[in-house]
């Protein structure tokens, strides 16, 4: 295996048994690819912006004299980059400009001749851009647009499962769902009549729709029924016999042919009878007249002479009707073939209740339902009906819908029209009738072939189209105006509706969410989330159990483990690792092709639609080196069921054992040994882990850690191979290898690191270089670690030495006992950054002012402020300290003559203003790490603002000049290299800068003249580019900020708060084993082992059996072995063992896994690399145990033996307080523990006198409102049960909502009296008022 520079520093030993078939795909591709498709203009490619424009344009005026045509669109240059957008609180976007043509036609001519064409680029608003990490920056905050899993357009056949009607009769229905347009439902009622509903309105007989489609009753019967043909001969009635139609009937007559009786009267016809009749080739049989009564005529019968209708089609035959047929010499007549078994007379019965008889009455009936109360006219009714399903502007099935529609009706072609046609509606009704007749099955609505994923690009496109439709209406009206000749396209188009539609979507849509940025895993999971909620999706209240449940088609597409607990369970899911969406938006997952029992390397992605037809083997099925199955019968999945199949019949095989789970679940080692409920909690809690100051990789991982850390975008990845030229805490410079540099490309890459910036969840984002000067790196190497990453691997927590044992009740109910050593070593110390804003407004009474001159505040309180009244960076502050001094004008009060006099003498003006400074909130203390000041254009900048601007300018110029210098040096080196290759002598050139270099007139040989000329041009271009950059940067820094109306200045203060672990903080492992820290114990009191090494964390052993998450125990054992190997390496390094011995031991360790493909060969490593590897392994050997393919018991024991521990994984411990040995051996090992973002500091809260609710006069609730604890109904019962009457009275009156009582109480306490006078609780008054609102008067009698 080839390892990157960073990987070589610390190799994770992989114990997976399965070979790696497919690399883990880029984990953010679902977001990034979707937006790319939306934004990139491609002709003839109907998707994205292009498709939206094509669907709306050209827009014609009502009178047809003018039209506006779309030509193309371009995206402009972004005003601010990502970092600037975040700091300034603006949206990271680009201007969208569209080239339009206004074509004006001549009015007079009959032919439409073009009078003139005007072309112009029109500004269509700002389009938010996606960052390289798959997020959007909207108003300065990072947001994620979550993909939606919604019901695919198409046709669905379903039933009510017998729940609608009291009889329990199953009523079948079909629903045609377009991508946009009206829904059409076809349904049976309990009487077996067929009805339709348009847009879920009142139902009408289905034949009304057929009449509206211009089908006559006769035609309808011909389409939906087969006919029995009868004829009259010699006054006898004969029937053309089709034997299979008689099956199951009880015949009321004998069947006799040539005097031979085949079937007796009253006999039920069976398959045997049918075979007999077929064999004898009986074509006609004589029947009695009564057999015809009750049957339905299928054609109109006319009078031979007058041609008037004698008998209408769909008439039930009676004796009178039959006599008419006889009398008018109709030899042949046609009757509908129906029966009660598999040919119901549903359409015929529906026609009988249908009052409409022709197209016009049917159209008017539909019009009345869609537009109740409006008088119908023929034109209006026709227009409405055509617009419902047959107009491309109003109705679109979309390619997906058409594909699903055709597939459902078993048609061959996948493509077709986006609107419905007559055949579509008839085929849907036919299929529904077949299902009712028992000749088909209903669809499974939760099958993933019926649900598709709508990603960002598609949602933004829909929103954009909505905006364009609003614009279209306005444009149509403007085009009908008379003064078109003077107008240009930009005068006609108003882009407001488009930008407001897009703003609304990104700002307030249910699927555009504030990014979860606790740690890199939280980010990735949020971007890979798939929600069934949102516009056009489900609602929490209406979603039943079936929708939320795990479905067999989720396999490899949607994770069965990771979903939130609570009301959203099962509605919000996570994409599986290898899953992707296909062109139609259906989820697909990869499989290996199997041919004749041999597994090939060919990989095919299958969607849920295709997967049902194949037999698919498990990923862990044993195969030999030639790809043949070991066993004759293999466990496989087929059509959602498990079973044993012959190996020759297998079509595909899973790609990997972790194929079924999501990224979050795949990070849980030994997931296969955990109960699913706990695994769900484990996957969810990893997302809540707070990045610690010192990140530490897990000793026991799953091998997914590197992919997550790199794809999340928090680390810095090398774009090109090269050598580290310069490195410090905030910048890395890489010099590119000459052969990798293309012409006109700079030979240097500069990476600026993010330092101590605030995340959405107030955690700290900080990048730290993990390379050294002069290191050689390759493209894709990790250059710097971000939050929660360690050498390019995800590191959410810390490896802790844990023991499972009770300790004095301190680990009762999942509590966690922690050693003081953990706190002292800052293992779980985290940094939280708070942003506090001070806004300076222009009020009605005057302008607020930021100043250090604040009334009634002592010098000491202002000691940390500068002259402008803003705190210094680096100041340590605690709650109540002034951060920004601000004064607000007071309302003018009426002064007494004496005050006026005093004011005239002493010029006292300070009382006109009140102190409204920004202070540190309660319970917070920290260090000021940054100050940002935003000033409105035209407002005079204060001294501090100018200082900050100068500092930013200096930094920007320094950055750019240094960059230019590095590029210069680089070009000089390249020139020198070129000169050195020459054999001829050239005088040595000494020059301080390239300008001097190029000024010297040197005659170069022809060979290299061109190369040097190219470098010269490149340098000139670079200089130009840098001058432009400096100009732009200066302009951006100096220009005023766009602030909301009425705001003059905003000062943002960033406070860094360091939080150590403390009792009350929530901690968890990766297996759903969560608990609260109960005590931080002195290290000398903790249990210790034979070597005197104390335990870090003591956990409760009772937390394991009932929860069934044994993964934590196996992790503990494996962690112990990994640490043991680290100890051996550490001893070897300490005793200065020879490098070859270290190499030999490391090779032995890395050869432990079973998989030959994952064996690591250390022969290619240099001695320095081996030494570095050993130093990084002294803390412990990192092990990967992939999900469902992990380390087994035998291997754990082997590792424990190798690291000189008992194979039981238990050791003898001694009590730290008494020094006595514990009675039994204790399970001790290393577990990866996380500190979750549920910190006691954020939750701890106490209320003194605070705010009250306006109506009930009771204290508010919650920390944010400075509220109290609710004393509820059950708590009142408790006091009643104890008979604590005084306490109860106090609780219900003075401590709650007795307004007069509480003021008296306050007075009494002040004056030293300790008695209370309870009055009337306010809530009683509220009750009285509410009863009065019902018209009942209540008055209290004072007697």
From Swiss-Prot:
Gene Ontology molecular function terms on file:
DNA binding; DNA-directed RNA polymerase activity; ribonucleoside binding
Keyword annotations of the record: DNA-directed RNA polymerase, Nucleotidyltransferase, Transcription, Transferase
* Matching CDD domains: RNA_pol_B_RPB2 (cd00653)
* Keyword Ion transport appears in the UniProt entry: no
Q: Does the keyword Nucleotidyltransferase apply?
A: yes
The cross-references to PROSITE patterns, in alphabetical order and at most eight, read: RNA_POL_BETA (PS01166)
Superkingdom of the organism of origin: Bacteria
Please give the InterPro entries that the UniProt record associates with this protein: DNA-dir_RNA_pol_bsu_ext_1_sf, DNA-dir_RNA_pol_bsu_external_1, DNA-dir_RNA_pol_su2, DNA-dir_RNAP_su2_dom, DNA-dir_RNAP_su2_hyb_sf, RNA_pol_bsu_bac, RNA_pol_bsu_CS, RNA_pol_bsu_protrusion
Q: What reaction gets catalysed by this protein?
A: RNA(n) + a ribonucleoside 5'-triphosphate = RNA(n+1) + diphosphate
At the top of the EC hierarchy, this enzyme's class is transferase
Biological processes annotated in GO = DNA-templated transcription
Q: How does it assemble?
A: The RNAP catalytic core consists of 2 alpha, 1 beta, 1 beta' and 1 omega subunit. When a sigma factor is associated with the core the holoenzyme is formed, which can initiate transcription.
Q: What does this protein do?
A: DNA-dependent RNA polymerase catalyzes the transcription of DNA into RNA using the four ribonucleoside triphosphates as substrates.
Name of this chain's protein? DNA-directed RNA polymerase subunit beta
The organism of origin for this protein: Buchnera aphidicola subsp. Cinara cedri (strain Cc)
- State the gene name recorded for this protein: rpoB
């Amino acid at each position: 295996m080839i390892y990157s520079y960073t990987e070589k520093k610390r190799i994770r030993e992989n114990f997976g048994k399965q070979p790696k078939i497919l690399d883990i795909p880029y984990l953010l591709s679902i977001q990034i690819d979707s937006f790319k498709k939306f934004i990139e203009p491609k002709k003839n490619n109907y998707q994205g912006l292009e498709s939206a424009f094509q669907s709306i344009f050209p827009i014609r005026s009502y009178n047809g004299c003018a039209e506006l045509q779309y030509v193309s669109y371009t995206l402009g240059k972004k005003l601010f980059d990502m970092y600037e957008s975040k700091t300034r609180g603006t949206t990271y976007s680009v201007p969208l400009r569209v080239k339009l043509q206004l074509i004006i036609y001549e009015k007079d001519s009959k032919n439409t001749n073009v009078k003139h064409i005007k072309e112009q680029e029109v500004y269509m608003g700002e389009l938010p851009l996606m960052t390289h990490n798959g997020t959007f920056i909207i108003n300065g905050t990072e947001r994620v647009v979550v993909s939606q899993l919604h019901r695919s357009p198409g046709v669905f056949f379903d039933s009510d499962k017998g729940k609608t009607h009291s009889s329990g009769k199953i009523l079948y229905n079909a629903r045609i769902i377009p991508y946009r347009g009206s829904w059409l439902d076809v349904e049976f009622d309990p009487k077996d009549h067929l009805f339709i509903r348009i847009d879920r309105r009142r139902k009408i007989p289905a034949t009304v729709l057929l009449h509206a489609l211009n089908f006559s009753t006769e035609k309808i019967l011909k389409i939906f029924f087969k006919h029995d043909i009868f004829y009259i001969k010699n006054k006898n009635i004969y029937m053309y016999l089709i034997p299979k139609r008689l099956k199951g009937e009880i015949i009321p007559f004998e069947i006799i042919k040539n005097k031979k009786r085949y079937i007796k009267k009253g006999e039920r016809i069976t398959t045997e009878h049918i075979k007999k009749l077929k064999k004898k080739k009986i074509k006609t049989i004589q029947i009695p007249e009564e057999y015809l009564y009750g049957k339905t005529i299928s054609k109109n019968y006319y009078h031979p002479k007058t041609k008037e209708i004698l008998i209408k089609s769909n008439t039930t035959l009676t004796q009178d009707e039959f006599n008419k047929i006889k009398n008018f010499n109709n030899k042949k007549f046609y009757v509908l073939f129906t029966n009660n078994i598999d040919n119901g007379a549903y359409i015929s019965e529906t026609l009988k209740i249908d009052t409409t008889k022709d197209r016009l009455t049917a159209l008017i009936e539909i019009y009345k339902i869609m537009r109740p109360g409006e008088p119908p006219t023929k034109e209006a009714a026709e227009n409405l009906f055509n617009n419902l399903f047959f107009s491309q502007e109003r109705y679109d099935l979309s390619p997906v819908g058409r594909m699903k529609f055709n597939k459902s009706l078993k048609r061959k072609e996948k493509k077709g029209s986006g609107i419905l046609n007559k055949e579509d509606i008839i085929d849907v009704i036919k299929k529904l009738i077949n299902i009712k007749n028992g000749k088909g099955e209903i669809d499974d609505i939760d099958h993933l072939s019926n649900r598709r994923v709508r990603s960002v690009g598609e949602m933004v496109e829909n929103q954009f189209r909505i905006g364009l439709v609003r614009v279209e209406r306005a444009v149509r009206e403007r085009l009908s105006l008379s003064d078109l000749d003077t107008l240009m396209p930009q005068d006609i188009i108003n882009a407001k509706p488009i930008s407001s539609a897009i703003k609304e979507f990104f700002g307030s849509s249910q699927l555009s969410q504030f990014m979860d940025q606790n740690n890199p895993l939280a980010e990735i999971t949020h971007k890979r989330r798939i929600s069934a909620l949102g516009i056009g999706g489900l609602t929490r209240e209406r979603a039943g159990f079936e929708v939320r449940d795990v479905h067999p088609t989720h396999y490899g597409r949607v994770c069965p483990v990771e979903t939130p607990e609570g009301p959203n369970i099962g509605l919000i899911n996570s994409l599986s690792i290898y899953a992707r969406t296909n062109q139609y938006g259906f989820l697909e997952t990869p499989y290996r092709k199997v041919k004749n029992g041999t597994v090939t390397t060919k990989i095919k992605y299958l969607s849920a639609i295709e997967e049902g037809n194949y037999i698919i083997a498990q990923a862990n099925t044993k195969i030999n080196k030639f790809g043949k199955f070991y066993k004759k019968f293999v466990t496989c999945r087929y059509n959602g069921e498990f079973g044993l199949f012959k190996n020759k019949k297998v079509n595909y095989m899973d790609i990997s054992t972790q194929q079924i789970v999501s990224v979050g679940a795949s990070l849980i080692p030994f997931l296969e040994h955990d109960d699913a409920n706990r695994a769900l909690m484990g996957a969810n809690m990893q997302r809540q882990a707070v990045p610690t100051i010192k990140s530490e990789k897990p000793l026991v991982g799953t091998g997914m850690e590197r992919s997550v850390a790199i794809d999340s975008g928090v680390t810095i990845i090398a774009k090109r191979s090269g050598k580290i030229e310069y490195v410090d805490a905030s910048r890395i410079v890489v010099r590119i290898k000459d052969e990798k540099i293309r012409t006109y490309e700079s030979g240097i890459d500069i990476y600026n690191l993010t330092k101590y910036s605030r995340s959405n969840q107030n955690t700290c984002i900080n990048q730290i270089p993990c390379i050294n000067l002069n290191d050689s790196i390759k493209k894709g190497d990790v250059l710097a670690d971000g939050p929660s990453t360690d050498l390019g691997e995800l590191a959410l927590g810390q490896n802790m030495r844990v023991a499972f044992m009770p300790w004095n009740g301190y680990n009762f109910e999942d509590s966690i006992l922690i050693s003081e050593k953990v706190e002292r070593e800052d293992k779980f110390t985290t940094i939280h950054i708070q942003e506090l804003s001070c806004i300076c407004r222009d009020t009605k009474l005057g302008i607020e002012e930021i100043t250090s001159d604040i009334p009634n505040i002592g010098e000491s309180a202002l000691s940390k402020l500068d002259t402008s009244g803003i705190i210094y960076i680096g100041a340590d502050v605690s709650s109540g300290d002034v951060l920004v001094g601000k004064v607000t004008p007071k309302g003018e009060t009426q002064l007494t003559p004496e005050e006026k006099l005093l004011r005239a003498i002493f010029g006292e003006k300070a009382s006109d203003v009140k102190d409204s400074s920004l202070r540190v909130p309660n319970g917070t203390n920290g260090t000021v790490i940054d100050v940002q000041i935003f000033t409105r254009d035209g407002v005079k900048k204060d001294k501090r603002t100018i200082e900050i601007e100068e500092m930013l300018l200096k930094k920007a110029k320094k950055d750019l000049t240094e960059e230019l210098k590095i590029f210069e040096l680089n070009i000089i080196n390249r020139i020198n290299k070129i000169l050195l290759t020459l054999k001829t002598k050239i005088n040595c050139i000494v020059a301080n800068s390239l300008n001097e270099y190029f000024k010297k007139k040197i005659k170069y040989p022809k060979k290299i003249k061109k190369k040097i000329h190219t470098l010269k041009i490149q340098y000139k271009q670079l200089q130009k580019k840098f001058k432009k950059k400096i100009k732009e940067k200066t302009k951006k820094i100096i220009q005023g900020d766009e602030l909301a109306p009425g705001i003059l200045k905003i000062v943002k203060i960033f406070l860094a708060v360091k939080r150590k672990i403390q009792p009350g903080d929530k901690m968890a492992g990766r297996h759903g084993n969560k608990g609260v820290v109960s005590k931080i114990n002195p290290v000398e009191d903790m249990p210790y082992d034979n070597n005197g090494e104390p335990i870090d964390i003591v956990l409760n052993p009772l937390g394991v059996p009932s929860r069934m998450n044994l993964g934590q125990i196996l992790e503990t054992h494996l962690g112990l072995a990994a640490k043991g190997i680290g100890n051996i390496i550490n001893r070897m390094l300490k005793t200065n063992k020879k490098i070859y011995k270290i190499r030999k031991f490391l090779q032995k360790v890395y050869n432990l896994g079973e998989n030959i493909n994952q064996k690591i060969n250390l022969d290619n490593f240099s001695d320095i690399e081996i030494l570095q590897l050993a130093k990084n392994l002294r803390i412990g050997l990192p092990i990967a145990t992939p999900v469902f393919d992990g380390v087994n018991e035998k291997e754990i024991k082997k590792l424990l033996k190798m690291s000189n521990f008992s194979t039981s994984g238990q050791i003898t411990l001694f009590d730290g307080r008494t020094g006595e040995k514990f009675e039994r051996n204790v399970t001790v090992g290393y577990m990866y523990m996380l500190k979750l973002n549920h910190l006691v500091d954020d939750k701890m809260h106490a209320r003194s006198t605070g705010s009250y609710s306006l109506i009930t006069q009771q204290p508010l609730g919650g920390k944010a409102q400075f509220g109290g604890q609710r004393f509820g109904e059950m708590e009142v019962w408790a006091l009643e049960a104890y008979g604590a009457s005084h306490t109860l009275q106090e609780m219900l009156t003075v401590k709650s909502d007795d307004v007069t009582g509480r003021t008296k109480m306050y007075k009494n306490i002040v004056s030293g009296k300790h008695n209370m006078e309870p009055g009337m609780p306010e809530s009683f008054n509220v009750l009285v008022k509410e009863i009065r609102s019902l018209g009942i008067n209540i008055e209290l009698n004072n007697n």
